[in-house]
Amino acid sequence: MTTQELRPSAGVRLSVPVERYELKCGAALLVSPRPGAPVTALELHLKGGPSLDPERKEGTAYLTSALLSQGTENWSEEELAAQLEPMGAQIIGSASGLAARVEGKEWKSLAAILSEMILRPTFPADRVKLQKQRLQHRLLIERENPQAQARLGFRRLIYGDHWMGRAAYGSLESVTNINSRTLRAHHKRAWVSN
């Protein structure tokens, strides 16, 4: 085990124990054990995130992550939910990865479920359609929200046409162009390229 020192500001030192594991797929797993902690947090961060969205299909990375829990080769969405609910597990997707939380002793079960979701998602067409509708509804609401528009306008002002100048979950127009095939291709390239 190594100890990594974090220095958020001058004079403050935080020592965090970290165990590093190299996985067969080429990814690195960093573990910071907290013996006796009531909750375990698992996080997966991907290189690239929304920067890998295809042109005119911005929001692909976000939707890919959002749909990982909607069915896998071995489990339907309902079967995944039936496994997660008794554990009190929570999984949240973002354009840059996944975050999950569970009672401390259940972390191995959660890790197995996450592995299935990450390695074998199916992106069912009906679930893709539903998630796109939800995202488009969110985008319509944000279009009328001055705070959301100010944040996006500021990003565009600072970053211009760079990918950081747009919302990580795309636009009404770009989300329309995304389908199951787009998501499978992105997943293959960004999540399991090895």
Which residues does each PLM region occupy?
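M16/MPP (pitrilysin/insulinase) zinc-metallopeptidase core fold and M16-derived inactive scaffolds
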Residues: 41-106, 144
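Short, well-ordered turn and helix-capping elements at secondary-structure junctions
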Residues: 25-27, 46-50, 179-182
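Acidic/histidine-enriched segments that form metal/cofactor-coordinating
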Residues: 81-193
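Short connector loops/turns at beta-strand edges and beta->alpha or beta->beta junctions
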Residues: 35-37, 47, 159-163
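Proteolytic maturation boundary segments
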Residues: 1-33, 39, 43
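Short, well-ordered loop/turn elements at secondary-structure boundaries
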Residues: 24-25, 192-194
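Short clusters of small/polar residues that mark proteolytic maturation junctions
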Residues: 33-34, 168
